[in-house]
Amino acid sequence: VASLACAREVLRGPCLVVYGDVFCRRYHLQRLLLDEADLVIAVDRQISRHGDDTDPRDLVRARHTNQTQTPFTEEDGILASSANSDHFTDFDGEWIGALKLSAKGAAWVCESLDTLPAEKLSKMHLIDLLDLLVKAGRTVKIQYVSGDWLSVESLVDLTHAGNL
């Protein structure tokens, strides 16, 4: 969040905020940009784990406007809460690290950044900022994706990035 705060002066929207270590197919980003909602995130229903990997991930809980929503329907959701956690079964999916902001969404993010003390900014993660926005009453739309993205954490991951 500290690096996002450094870019505050140019954060006007519409824009994408994407983790620097994320590789994904272009259509994930295009779909985010085409969405008219003010705050939109891409979430994979499959939480990526490798073998016995129990490292925390950026996880989200969703609420859906359609009460018959199942993990297999394509309807987008609304972010209910988010956290960096290793309690995988308590969440509905993994945020891939891509956030689309409209002009209004960018203003909301800047407002949230302005409320945070410097010491909290330096320790806070983007997933925490998303949760803060939800707690402030902002609606964060979820677009579900199914694979075709990768967070590069190792040289092995980097070699897999070539497959995207």
Locate each region found by the language model.
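Short phosphate-binding loop-to-helix
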Residues: 1-14
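Short, well-ordered alpha-helical microsegments
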Residues: 4, 25-27, 127
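Conserved alpha/beta core of the MobA/IspD/sugar-nucleotide pyrophosphorylase nucleotidyltransferase superfamily
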Residues: 90-164
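Conserved core of the sugar-phosphate nucleotidyltransferase
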Residues: 25-116
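Short beta-strand-to-loop acidic/aromatic patch adjacent to the donor-nucleotide binding site
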Residues: 13-23
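Short coil/turn segments at beta-strand junctions that form active-site/ligand-binding loops
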Residues: 13-14, 37, 138
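Structural beta-sheet core signal
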Residues: 17, 41-42, 142
